């Protein structure tokens, strides 16, 4: 029955069950829902029903649901369920998720919650919180299966069964020596295909791809993407195994980094969502826009400088927006290609040279097609072949310049260790506006007496 219900129907059904105190019917509904569904229902239901909704959920339900909620709602849940239930849920949460959640709390509340947790779990969480914010150590979990290299397949299976319930991932078994150094890795498939008395060290892969605990999360994401891993081991000095990073955490990193790059690319300000207040959104966007406003005044100065040319040939004004707009568009297209390549670290010297020449050839093809089209349009529209030549040649040159600026500027910034996404959309477009107007009016001035 639940499968065919919309979220609105589900919320209404749950509210009725909460009101009537029908715990058994409530459980039958909840048992058919995924953690995401429970989290969505909590966020969307009226505030007055949330406390009772949480009181009817088990600790396991709350633990699973918290993992699907945004930080602000996670804090709401922990505050509403009370200290005892919150502590039980925190003991079962993934340590990396809990470490990130506790960062949002004030020191006093953080210490209270950590002290109320099981000693082993509290120690593990505090260990993660000692790592830098965007490092592999901060996002790793200590809930994984490691096996001594002297184990047999039979011993490994016994340990795997005992740890399967609490381990975040059992796709890979990590093999260590007496010093807890990572010496190999074994897949679950290889384990079950091995003979019971066969040694793990005879089955394991010794070339292990791992991440350093202090390595940036984006670099870890690239490693997992490159090798198609479901998890990657995290090591400290001397290759000592300290945890693993799983692919679900990497997906969160990729989404977050993509959001940040898009915000920079659009110069729209950081952390702006549908719920952001208007004055906050305006405050975050204004610095870029004010900067671009003053840069844009240069375009106005250029037009003012060539005022005499405009007075003599008014038709020049008709094509001015088209020339500057097309230049900005092609620059933004090239910029998107380069930023994507840089974000995936596909750029080496050979690739950069090949990309620049490829974009140059592309701009020539695009410029040739567009300039021929606009020449035909201007001749038919204005009946002036020379005007058509001026517009077409200007467009041809500006499209080449726009494409190359969108290609070369982010590469230069990358080499200077500056985030290339900063030199994005609006800035490239504004700079290309200036260049396109200079070229357009420069060519027009050269032929002004013949026009």
From Swiss-Prot:
- Residues given in the record as Mg(2+) 1 binding sites: 64, 228
User: Locate the CBS domain: which residues?
Assistant: 140-203, 204-260
Record-linked Pfam families: CBS (PF00571), MgtE (PF01769), MgtE_N (PF03448)
Localization recorded for this chain is:
Cell membrane
Key word Protein transport present in the record? no
Which ranges make up the Extracellular topological domains here? 307-311, 449-451
Entry's transmembrane regions: 286-306, 312-332, 372-392, 393-413, 428-448
Signal sequence, renumbered to the chain: none
Q: Which annotated residues bind Mg(2+) 5?
A: 260-261, 419
Q: Which GO terms describe its molecular function?
A: magnesium ion transmembrane transporter activity; metal ion binding
Tell me which residues bind Mg(2+) 2. 96, 249
Residues annotated as binding Mg(2+) 6 are 433
Show which residues sit on the Cytoplasmic side of the membrane: 1-285, 333-371, 414-427
Q: Which residues form a coiled coil?
A: none
Q: Activity regulation here? A: Binds cyclic di-AMP (c-di-AMP), which may regulate the transporter activity.
Main localization of the protein described in the UniProt heading? membrane
Residues that, per the record, bind Mg(2+) 3: 218, 257
Q: Name one GO cellular component term.
A: plasma membrane
| Gene disruption phenotype | Deletion of the gene results in a significant growth defect under rich-medium growth conditions and in strong dependency on supplemental extracellular magnesium.
Bilayer topology: Multi-pass membrane protein
Keyword Repeat assigned? yes
Q: Which family does it belong to?
A: Belongs to the SLC41A transporter family.
Q: Which NCBIfam families match?
A: mgtE
| UniProt-recorded name of the protein | Magnesium transporter MgtE
Protein encoded by which gene? mgtE
